[in-house]
Structures are given as C-alpha cells and as structure tokens.
Amino acid sequence: MVRKLVQSFLFIALFFVSCNTRQKQKAKPSFLSAKEVVRLNQVVYKSTIAESLSQYSPEFEAVFIPEAINGNFAFIAKKKETEQYALVIRGSVIEFSNEGFQNFVMQDFNIFTIKSWPYTDTIQQAYVSNGAWIGFQNLLQLRDKSSGLTIKEFIEQKIPVEASFVITGHSLGGNLAYPMAGYLKNELPAEKGGNLQLITFGAPAVGNAAFVKDMEEKFPSAERYTTDKDIATVFPDMDKVREIAHITGLDSVLQLSKLSIPGINKLKTSDLLDIAGEILKATKVINETNRYVQSQRHLRLLTVDAAAVPADTSYTAESLFNRAYQFHKVDRYADLLGVNPLE
C-alpha cells in the first residue's frame, strides 16, 4: 500500500514538473526594449551589418540581410539566447551628413501626393504619403541574400510562432516602420500577427487620422519616441514647425536676409513657414480628411537641453540644417535612452 502511494506521488510530481516545463517552453518572450532596438537603429546605418553587430551588439545576430532596393534597406536581428527578433528599417542615408539634412526634408520626404492605404481592418479613408508608399513597396521587395525569402515569407517560414517581433526604425526608417507594421499585422497569420510590436525614433508623420486610428487599434502599446526639439517629427505641420524653430533657436539662425539665396531679401522665418503652409493647402495635401497627424497614444516624449547644441551664428543655410540634424540624429535618441554613440 505504501509503495503504491509513493509511486502515485512520484507520478503526480513528474506530471506537474512536465506540465510546468512545457508551459515555460511555450511562454512567449517579452518584446525587445526601446534601449535595445535604438542600438540596432544605430547599427543599421553601418555598411557591414553582421560585423557591426558583432562589434557593437554581440548579443544579437543578423538572420535576414538583403540588398538595398532604391536606397531602402532593412535587416532582421535575433537575440542569440532568446526568441526575440527585430526588423530594423534604415532611414535616409543622405541625412547622415549635415548638409544632406535639407534633402531629407525637401526631397526625400515626398508628401505632396497621397496614396490610399488598403491594409486596414474596419477603418475607411486611410491615406499615407506617396513617399511612404514608395518606400514601403521597396521594402516588400527585399529578399534575404541567403534564403531568397521576402520579409513576410521569412517571418512565416523561419521565425517560431512563440517568438516576439519588433518593427523599428529611425527617421525615414521610423516613417516606413508604420506602414510595414500595419501590413504585417494585417497579412500574417493571426498566431504570428499577435506577436508584433512597433517602436520608432524621430519618425515623420506617415498618413492621416484614419491611418493613425487603424495603427493605434493594431498596436495599442506601440512606442513613438520623439524629442521636444526634433522638427522632422512634426513636419509638415507648419504651426508645430514654427513652434520648434523658435524653441531651438532655428528662427534666429534662419535670417533669410543674410542667406545667399538669389531673389530672396528680407523675408522673415514666419513668412517662409506661412508660405510653406499655404503651398501644402493649395496642393490639397492638408484638408480635413488628409491632414497628416501623429499618434498621441504612441508618443514617448524625450526632452533635450538646447544648450547641448550650441547655435551657429554664421547664418548660412548649412548652419540651419546642421542644427536641426543635431536634434534629430539617431545618436541623440540613443543618448537620451542611455546608449553610447557608435564609433
């Protein structure tokens, strides 16, 4: 009798241990943190991803590396010891020279035409900028050099169901992370679409209020990091651009009467921004339906000390964009999250 009781006890104990082990094995890992993925957003601008991860983030490995298409590039990183993944979308390469920042605002960020966004659940009349649509289409074409798979195919075929997956990007990479995340959430099987998270840094607005509402429903806990002095994140809202220009001192730097711009004399900063705003309205980019907005639910606001970026009193166009760049660069966001700049 005693022997049978002991055997029964051992059987029950082993059963509970086995169940507990299976539960642990099936437990979904947490999402990578903003601090972890901002480091990956620094790495994505390096020319050699695998080597840069080994040097700067040895706890990660690159499992998906494609060739860039029309300047758009992204890679998938995996934390070696866990099933935690991130799709890291590169921003505009040209912004990483101070002189190139103006190209990012005036040329790369193609906002003057809009595109209907089809990957919503119940939301109607969602639109994104034409620039975001073009970049998103390029991302869909990326194929891993090793497996030949697209991003969606790689997630479906190579990433375990229980894995966590963050879509992230800085600047235009963050801009493109929004449509890419919305697309994956909509198109992946439910068991994988439920394991997605969205984290961006310094991302300009992507689309209208309907697009943002759909993204907030899909990703209620997404994190959109911006600083209080980053003009890129409020463009093309000219009222907010004017406000940040004043806070950062850009309005004092942008003294157009002192700039070497043919045909422009004694034009105030506020006049320039008013003209830009009128252009956006005249082209019907801004109206009640299609006004570009950012998610306030996703917002994670970081504060920058303006004194950390001394003003340049040379009053040149270069000095204006250089100062804006200093508040927008990925290393600024990394620093605010406690991550060192890369060499």
Enumerate the predicted regions with their spans.
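N-terminal low-complexity, Ser/Thr- and acidic-residue-enriched intrinsically disordered segments
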Residues: 20-82, 90-92
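Bacterial Sec-dependent N-terminal signal peptides
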Residues: 1-28
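A conserved cap/lid and substrate-binding interface adjacent to the catalytic center
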Residues: 61-168, 188-191, 195, 218-219
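Short regulatory "switch" loops immediately downstream of catalytic or recognition motifs
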Residues: 94, 148, 152, 184-186, ...
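Lipolytic serine-hydrolase domain surface
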Residues: 212-343
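Serine-dependent carboxylesterase/thioesterase catalytic core
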Residues: 152-235
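Short, polar loop/linker segments at the starts of domains and inter-domain junctions
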Residues: 53-57, 102-105, 242
